[in-house]
């Protein structure tokens, strides 16, 4: 069974669940049978860009990918706010105020660092057991609570009289549509997102991404290894812990390793180049927090 990551450059109009379905279909057509597949963070259908898709044992890392920071390029069109905060919605507010380049740059520091943000009514958040977007589509008033997010970096890429394109590096839980709405309001006008592209999700950037056409070649017989990144590609942000054969055997059994000299923290334990587990190291003791069942081809 294949284990690892396919990084899809998701095209516009394709939902994240549909993207997972496309991977499953191509794997099935390539003769791999039933493979566990999951994605590392929902991307709106109208958005494009990096969508990490995990196969096999890599699906155990989807939670980490959901928690990872993301980087986006987005364009906000000034003068109209829509109910969805993007191109799909109907206009609910309008303004003739068009901010200058200096105005835009002057407000960006207010949206850098920890901020409070109200998510869009058209979002996948749960409200009384239902998706917020389902309630909004029924015409119900959706009131979502403000939440704390962090904007690590926000910079202006380009601008004209009607719109501005920005780059944002953000924490998990950040809604770019809400960020665009709030920037426009801070400028004394209104706005909505007309372009959204994810440039990076955790360790994966566009340089690792493949097109849907490239993915479809797998279903027609192209080698999967040409598009599949190894499981450990999703672990580059944490240090590796090299194990002896005896230690590797203990980790496979879920036993605690003791007397280790490394600093406290999260590590990925490996035997040779084979990832065995995520381990939490505290005061010299390493405990398995998530094990991987991979073949010992490189041990």
Please name every model-derived segment:
Residues 1-32, 36-46, 186-299:
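Accessory RNA 3′-end/elbow-binding domains used by RNA modification enzymes
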Residues 1-172, 176-210:
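Catalytic cores of RNA-modifying enzymes
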């Amino acid at each position: 069974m294949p284990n690892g990551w396919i990084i899809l450059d998701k095209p516009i109009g394709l939902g994240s669940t549909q993207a997972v379905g496309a991977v499953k279909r191509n794997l099935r057509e390539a003769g791999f049978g039933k493979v566990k597949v999951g994605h590392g963070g929902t991307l709106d259908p109208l958005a494009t860009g990096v969508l990490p898709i995990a196969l096999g044992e890599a699906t155990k890392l989807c939670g980490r990918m959901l928690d990872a920071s993301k980087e986006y390029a987005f364009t906000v069109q000034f003068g109209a706010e829509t109910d969805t905060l993007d191109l799909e919605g109907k206009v609910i507010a309008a303004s003739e105020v068009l901010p200058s380049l200096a105005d835009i740059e002057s407000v960006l520091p207010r949206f850098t660092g920890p901020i409070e943000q109200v998510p869009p009514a058209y979002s996948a958040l749960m409200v009384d057991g239902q998706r917020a977007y389902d309630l909004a589509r029924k015409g119900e008033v959706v009131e979502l609570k403000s939440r704390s997010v962090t904007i690590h970096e926000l910079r202006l890429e380009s601008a004209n009289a009607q719109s501005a394109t920005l780059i944002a590096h953000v924490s998990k839980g950040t809604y770019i549509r809400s960020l665009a709405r709030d920037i426009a309001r801070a400028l004394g006008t209104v706005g909505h997102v007309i372009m959204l592209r994810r440039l990076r999700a955790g360790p994966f950037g566009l340089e690792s991404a493949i097109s849907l056409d490239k993915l479809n070649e797998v279903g027609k017989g192209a080698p999967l290894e040409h598009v599949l990144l190894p499981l450990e590609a999703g672990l580059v942000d944490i240090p590796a812990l090299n194990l002896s054969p005896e230690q590797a055997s203990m980790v496979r059994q879920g036993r605690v390793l003791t007397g280790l000299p490394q600093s406290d923290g999260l590590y990925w334990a490996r035997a040779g180049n084979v990832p065995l587990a995520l381990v939490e190291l505290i005061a010299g003791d390493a405990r398995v927090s998530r094990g991987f069942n991979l073949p010992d081809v490189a041990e």
